Amino acid sequence: MKLAEKLGVETVVTVGAFITGRIAEHPQVYGAASELVLVKELEELGVKIIDSGAVTWMNGLIPGLAKVRNLKGLFLSGETSGFMIDPRAAMIILRVLVKKLGLQIDMTELEGQAKEIETALKQSSDKDSGSSGSSEYIG
C-alpha cells in the first residue's frame, strides 16, 4: 500500500474467481467495494454486488487495507465452475475493468480460448444427452 500511495494510486482492485461448482451458461461478475460510490458504479456496470458473507483471503484483505490508507478498494470476481481454467471468467472481469477504467484491450486471443471451451462444453453436453439409451437392467 505504501508503494500505491507513493505512485499516486487512487483505487486498488483485486480480481478472483466466484466458484459455483456448476457451469453457468451466462456467467456473471460479482463484486464488492470499500465505498458506496464505488458500489453504485459497479452496479451501473452490471456487477452483482456481494452483500452478504465476506470476501476472503487477499481479495478481501487488500481492498480493506486500501480503505485504511484512504484509498478506494474494490474486488471483482468472475463466475466459474472451478472445474477448469476458465477464460470466460477472465474475459467478463476484463470487460468490466475496460469500461470502468476507460481502457482498450485486445481480447481476441482470450475470446478465442473462451469459444473453444464453450464448444468443448457443448459437445460434451450433447454427447451426454445423446447417450441416454435404454436404462433397462441387464443383470
Regions found by a protein language model. Name each.
Residues M1-L7, G21-G139:
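Accessory terminal and edge-of-domain segments that mediate assembly/interaction
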Residues E10-T11:
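Structural motif
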